[in-house]
């Protein structure tokens, strides 16, 4: 079962929303993931990455949009993330999360100011958003798995507003399985550990990596 982040659940702020404009700044995207269901395009994630930062912007067909900036450590894990969720109606919600060795600290931006939430963790912790395959790719690369190996993470689920245990299994040299509460992703990987595409099981979404022209 997922654990709520303190008494200040991120999900309550995501539902309530904050009116405003996303403050996340990004560099020009170099790649994208196209998400489809049958012949329909469900969404697009534009992203870019250097050694220190990951930038991502997600546009869904429903009108929902996410903007993400993650600061990366030398081992490819995430040290800090800023995420903004913007609805079709222009309602914006912001969250900032720091990932320490044993503590995840979140700051939630609300109209009357900011609130703090913390959760103690054992082992590695990271952000997770099921529709951000750039973040999923970051998790795969930070796990440093060989063929047949697996790793467990405590993830702060940005969409659900809780924490949960996530497992990454390197099934074959060119594939991996990511599973957590109510989410299962089957990934096709390159030799460099990049996600080439895959399937969101249950939703029956397919996603494919493409270059931005």
Predicted regions located by residue number:
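Short, exposed beta-strand-loop hairpins at the edges of beta-sheets
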Residues: 186-190, 194-203
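Bacterial N-terminal signal peptides
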Residues: 9-17
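Short, small/polar residue-rich loop motifs at catalytic or cofactor-binding pockets
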Residues: 28-29, 65-66, 181-183
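Solvent-exposed helix/loop surface patches that form functional interfaces
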Residues: 28, 40-41, 87-180, 192, ...
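N-terminal mature ectodomain segment of secretory-pathway/periplasmic proteins
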Residues: 31, 36-108, 193
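Boundary at the C-terminal end of the N-terminal hydrophobic targeting segment
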Residues: 22-27
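Short, basic/aromatic-enriched C-terminal tail that caps enzymatic domains
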Residues: 204-211
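Bacterial N-terminal signal peptides that target proteins for export
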Residues: 1-10
């Amino acid at each position: 079962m997922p654990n709520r982040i303190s008494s200040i659940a991120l999900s309550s702020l995501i539902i309530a929303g904050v009116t405003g404009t996303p403050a996340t700044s990004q560099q020009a995207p170099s790649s994208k993931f196209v998400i489809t269901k049958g012949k329909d395009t469900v969404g697009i994630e534009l992203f870019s990455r250097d050694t220190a930062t990951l930038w991502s912007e997600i546009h869904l067909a429903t009108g929902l949009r996410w903007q993400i900036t993650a600061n990366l450590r030398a081992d490819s894990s995430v040290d800090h993330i800023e995420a903004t969720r913007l609805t079709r109606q222009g309602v914006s919600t912001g969250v900032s999360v720091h990932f320490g060795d044993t503590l995840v600290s979140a700051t939630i931006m609300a109209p009357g100011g900011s609130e703090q939430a913390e959760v103690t963790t054992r082992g590695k912790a990271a952000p997770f958003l099921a529709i951000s395959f750039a973040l999923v790719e970051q998790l795969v690369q930070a796990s440093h798995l060989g063929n047949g190996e697996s790793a467990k993470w405590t993830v702060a689920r940005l969409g659900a507003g809780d924490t949960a245990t996530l497992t990454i299994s390197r099934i074959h040299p060119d594939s991996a399985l990511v599973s957590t509460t109510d989410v299962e992703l089957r990934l096709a990987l390159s030799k460099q550990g990049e996600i080439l595409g895959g399937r969101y099981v249950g939703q029956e979404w397919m996603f494919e990596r493409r270059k931005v022209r």
